Amino acid sequence: MVAAEDVIPFLGRPSHWTIGRSAYETAHSWFDAAGRLPAALAALLATDPALAGAALERATFEKQTRLDDFGRPSQTDVLAEISTASGPAILAVEAKVDETFGPTVDEWRAEGSAGKAGRLAGLVARLGLDPHAVGPLRYQLLHRSAAALIEAGAAGIGDAILVVQSFSPPGLRAGFADFRTFTEAMGVPVREPGVLSGAVERGGTRLRFGWAQDAIRSERAAPA
């Protein structure tokens, strides 16, 4: 890919490419950064000394990760490999403007299609969650976190970070309460935007979480 518009064929629907919506804003934020990490993400990562000096090595938009044999892959908005003070890390980015994180686990499994029990059991085991307490959590956050761990494991990388790149106005922060609840369940709560969580080890990979408060392109200062 050489331009933000090259992302369009990989979107679920062409209509997702709309000014002010997450697909458009995410692609432009990454291409406008010209080979570096978007400033909001770089600032977030810099709050953890272990990830100091994070630099972008490569990134894939709309990265599909096979989770299991029970259904569709997880499709991460941006999956990047970065270099840090502690070595390489996988950065999984979920972008939002005012969208929710979709159904809760209880809502998702209520549909009752084949394979959901097997998928959920696998996600819960991989993430080390309490199977009796996942019902209120947003299903999307489970499978995005699992995808980050899977991609790190496949690459032999010991650190993974799941970040929400939010283009929501700071006063709104659509979805932040659900994200905080999920990270609390993981044992490494994100209490405020702009600060990374601590790390929790899962399957030999250190997993962190963060919320990067960004701005839509029309409101963002041009990069230096």
Model-predicted segments: where are they?
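Conserved catalytic cores of phosphodiester-cleaving nucleases, focusing on short active-site segments
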Residues: 78-80, 89-97, 144
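Short, well-structured alpha-helical interface segments that form or flank functional binding sites
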Residues: 71-74, 88, 136-146, 174
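Charged, often low-complexity linker/regulatory segments
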Residues: 1-43
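Catalytic cores of nucleic-acid endonucleases
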Residues: 96-166
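Non-catalytic C-terminal interaction segments of nucleic acid-processing enzymes
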Residues: 140-224
